[in-house]
From Swiss-Prot:
Homodimer. One of its GO terms (molecular function) is aminoacyl-tRNA deacylase activity. It is found in: Cytoplasm. It is an enzyme of class 6 (ligase). The keyword Coiled coil does not apply. This is Proline--tRNA ligase. Consists of three domains: the N-terminal catalytic domain, the editing domain and the C-terminal anticodon-binding domain. It holds the Pfam family tRNA-synt_2b. Its EC number is 6.1.1.15. PROSITE patterns: AA_TRNA_LIGASE_II.
């Protein structure tokens, strides 16, 4: 491809509304353009990258036995009403009416549609297992679209759905999809981690997320430094570093604490170590009108996902208001604690191993110091309530936990029978009786992968693409292309490289475009291999080669260029 025949839409300045680096560089490199909030047009340069992601996804999905389909992006409300999600989904679901006043939505996901397809096409266990996927445009009406493609409203997604007569078959396909996803992200050259995850609003019983590691990621990715254990922050089990509760060394005492409404103020004003404090959080109980106390150490954070799974606690988690606290306890949030508390208490594992600690006295501006379990109050129910922190023991007993930031690019679920029961998707089993199908769901954010790859690999000059993702593998930059000797050598090399199967962008812009601008554009776009053709180099029988990640260029004999590139470029 020649730049004279291409939409080379690079920009020198960074748009003011672009915050994250992938958004900035995709705009500056001429990959995308904003149409409206959360909506982007893919320009040729960006679309080449996305098509490469799609190609790898298709190859691995097909190799894993999945069948490609294409479902409508507009879905009838009746299917969502059958599943119960029409009312549940919230304002992110873009709803609309046709001219006949019938309700539809723009699909954020396709569980209902694929289940409807399966119930109409499948009748016997002999047709199972069946795994179908599509690469389709999705829409979620995010309240605050931001970060370009990282959190847009419209996005490209690969979503697959599998149907099974039993759990064993579902597990087999789930494992196959897990491996296919690992293959996809490995082939795309990404540093990623698959992690155990909560199933969230999709539902189901078992899931894994796939995260590209990047400092700009929105999610915490937890993994062991000595094993394959990995989980997201919601799912990671928090194991206390302590194994035995120390014996008491202090007496229980009631202390006036007028200037200690927070843990930080308690630590600063009274000299307590933060790990000797606790936070008492009052939440709504599962039983209407009931409140429950959840207690974590002062330096730990409550994990709301874990807390909401407790049978005594309302789901979703709702914190008690100040009015509710004063009516039930007689004190405000900064002065609460488990001693003489007229509510059911559940404490974190780390709290159960504390001694000589400080708690609120359930009287405004007063705390108890020197509190000890069993001596001053009984140990209540103990549960895993907190987020893990770096350095915690790995739950599998191997090593300690490391926390890095990640960008979620894939998610696989075992849905079970949630949707098939709601939509009555069943077949005749081997015994001739109806069997409700078990389902799996497997998604990859195709457009998000492009942005995540940039977040993982860039420098102050622009994007750094690997060979698998680059829009072009080679930037061919002639200096003084208007001269016969340079033009003839460049055109001959361009023909040889393209004939050999390389993707080449020939920068044939005229002499009004300086070599510096040409080099800067190719580095901004992130093309990994650059060949410079100059009359001076040709006089010596050489071309100049530079890799995007290298600081210095090297001379290559003209007759060795093709062999060199064939050995160097991953294809």
């Amino acid at each position: 491809m020649r730049t004279s025949q291409y939409l080379l839409a690079t920009q020198k300045e960074t748009p003011a509304d672009a915050v994250v680096i992938s958004h900035q560089l995709m705009l500056r490199a001429g990959m995308i353009r904003k149409l409206a909030s959360g909506l982007y047009t893919w320009l040729p340069m960006g679309l080449r990258v996305m098509r490469k992601v799609e190609a790898v996804v298709r190859e691995e999905m097909n190799a894993a036995g999945a069948l490609e389909v294409l479902m409508p992006s507009i879905q009838p409300a009746e299917l969502w009403q059958e599943s119960g999600r029409w009312e549940q989904y919230g304002p992110e679901l873009l709803r609309l009416k046709d001219r006949h006043d019938r309700d539809f939505c723009v699909g954020p996901t396709h569980e209902e549609v694929i289940t409807d397809l399966a119930r109409n096409e499948l009748s016997s266990y002999k047709q199972l297992p069946l795994n179908m996927y599509q690469i389709q445009t999705k829409f979620r009406d995010e309240i605050r679209p931001r970060f370009g493609l990282m959190r847009g409203r419209e996005f490209i997604m690969k979503d697959a759905y599998s149907f099974h007569a039993d759990q064993a078959s579902l597990q087999e396909t789930y494992d196959r999809m897990h491996q296919a996803y690992s293959n996809i992200f490995t082939r795309l050259g990404l540093d990623f981690r698959p992690v155990q995850a909560d199933t969230g609003s999709i539902g189901g019983s078992y899931s894994h997320e796939f995260h590209v590691l990047a400092s700009s990621g929105e999610d915490d990715v937890i993994f062991s430094d000595s094993s394959d254990y990995a989980a997201n922050i919601e799912k990671a089990e928090a194991i206390p570093r302590e194994t035995v509760r120390p014996a008491p060394t202090e007496e229980l005492r009631l202390v006036d604490t007028p200037n200690a409404k927070t843990i930080a103020e308690l630590v600063e004003n009274f000299g307590l170590a933060i790990e000797k404090t606790v936070k008492t959080l009052i939440v709504h109980g599962a039983e209407e009108g009931k409140l429950v106390a959840l207690i974590v150490r002062g330096d730990h954070e409550l994990n709301e996902i874990k807390a909401a799974k407790l049978e005594q606690v309302a789901d979703p988690l709702v914190m008690a208001s100040d009015t509710e606290l004063r009516a039930a306890i007689g004190a405000g949030a900064g002065s609460l604690g488990p001693l003489n508390l007229p509510l059911e208490c559940i404490i974190d594992r780390s709290v159960a191993l504390m001694s000589d600690f400080g708690i609120g006295a359930n009287i405004d501006d007063k705390h108890y110091f020197g509190v000890n379990w069993e001596r001053d109050l009984p140990v209540p129910q103990v549960a895993d309530l907190r987020n893990v922190v770096e350095g915690d023991p790995s739950p599998d007993g191997q090593g300690t936990l490391v926390i890095k930031r990640g960008i979620e690019v894939g998610h696989i679920f075992q849905l079970g029978t949630k949707y098939s029961e709601a939509l009555k998707c069943q077949v005749l089993g081997e015994n001739g009786k109806p069997v409700v199908l078990s389902m799996g769901c497997y998604g990859i954010g195709v457009s998000r992968v492009v942005a995540a790859a940039i977040e993982q690999s860039y420098d102050d000059k622009g994007i750094i693409w690997n060979d698998a993702l680059a829009p072009f593998q080679i930037a061919l930059v002639p200096l003084r292309y208007e001269t016969d000797v340079v033009r003839e050598a460049t055109d001959k090399l361009y023909a040889e490289l393209t004939a050999a199967g390389f993707e080449v962008l020939l920068d044939d812009r005229d002499k009004k475009t300086s070599p510096g601008i040409k080099f800067a554009d190719m580095e901004l776009i992130g093309i990994p291999h650059r060949i410079v053709v100059s009359d001076r180099g040709l006089a010596d029988g050489n071309l100049e080669y530079k890799h995007r990640t290298e600081s210095e260029a090297q001379a290559l004999p003209l007759n060795e260029v093709l062999t060199f590139l064939q050995a160097r470029i991953r294809r």
